[in-house]
Amino acid sequence: MEAVQNDTALANIEPYFAKNDTNLVMILSDREEYAGEVLRNLILLSRNYPVIVLGSPSWNNFASIDAAYFHQLQLHYFTPYLVDYRNPDVRNFIKRFRNTFGFYPVKTNNRGMHFAMMGYDMACMIIPQAFRYRKSLRECFNPHLKGLQGDFRFYRSSSCAGYTRHSLYLVRYGKDYSVTPVLWE
């Protein structure tokens, strides 16, 4: 069953919830105050109903929302960026960045992109190819690249079009306080 809500209230959503089935709630907002209010209300409802929330990676940057809510509500979100901190290349980059600049590369945008890592990925993947192939880069460009922020899959819609990135990850917060990618083929 679908319950459409607006910005004003969540009071009438409970009748749509099922006690014996998982209730998937999609919150299409990047407004911190709204997302926080909805999540607080869903925490209360989750005491009586199983709830999973599909939200936004921008919520990771919201200071006023308790990160425990993400785990209690099993937050899922899609993101084109996924940093695996167990990856030796990522660990080495962070160590070298810290030694060079005196701080950790933590600045992200509202989609979860690490600016320092994006710059590094672009420098390591694109610039060497641009110097090597110059004007013929388009014909020699490798559309499947691995970077610090995950795999990059680029596709062209036509022979006269540029490349568009099509990599996407689904991230899941677990009740056990894990944060893991959901893998699919």
Listing of model-derived features with the role each one plays in the protein:
Residues E2-V4, I27-E32, G55-W59, F78-L82, ...:
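Active-site-proximal beta-strand/loop segments in catalytic clefts of secreted hydrolases
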Residues N6, R31-A35, R86-V90, G112-A123, ...:
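Solvent-exposed, acidic/flexible segments
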